[in-house]
């Protein structure tokens, strides 16, 4: 599937992801494969099966794909991003223990990153800028 440029070209591929994730939902609802989705307990298991040729591709969040391609996979290729379904949006955050003395410090740092535009610049560079993958439809 390395040369795929459309969702239609993915329908007969064996695609894997971690069970119980929004990535699974995206495969089911966006790709709508003609094959059974290969589900794994962890994304590490899915990438291991991809590397060994047991599955044709994986679906997960874009930052993880870039990391795996650059640091873990031998010859990995990112063909693109799936379009959103409109029903869910990926959101990430920082988790601290309740009552952590770091809470105020982390909030202050995030507010400062937002205020001076650094957060938007980081998002553009790492999530949606030149390092992003094209939307495939």
Task: Give the ranges of each region predicted by the language model.
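Proline/Glycine/Serine-rich low-complexity intrinsically disordered segments
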Residues: 1-137
């Amino acid at each position: 599937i390395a040369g795929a440029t459309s969702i239609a070209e993915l329908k007969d591929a064996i695609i894997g992801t971690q069970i119980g994730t929004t990535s699974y939902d995206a495969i089911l609802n966006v790709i709508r494969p003609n094959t059974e989705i290969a589900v794994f307990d962890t994304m590490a298991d899915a990438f291991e099966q991809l590397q060994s040729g047991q599955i044709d591709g994986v679906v997960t969040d874009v930052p993880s794909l870039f990391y795996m391609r650059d640091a873990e996979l031998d010859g990995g290729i990112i063909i693109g991003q799936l379009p959103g379904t409109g029903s869910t949006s990926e959101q990430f955050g920082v988790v601290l223990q309740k009552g952590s003395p770091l809470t105020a410090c982390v909030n202050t740092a995030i507010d400062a990153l937002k205020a001076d535009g650094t957060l938007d610049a980081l998002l553009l560079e790492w999530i949606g800028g030149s390092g992003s993958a094209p939307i495939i439809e």
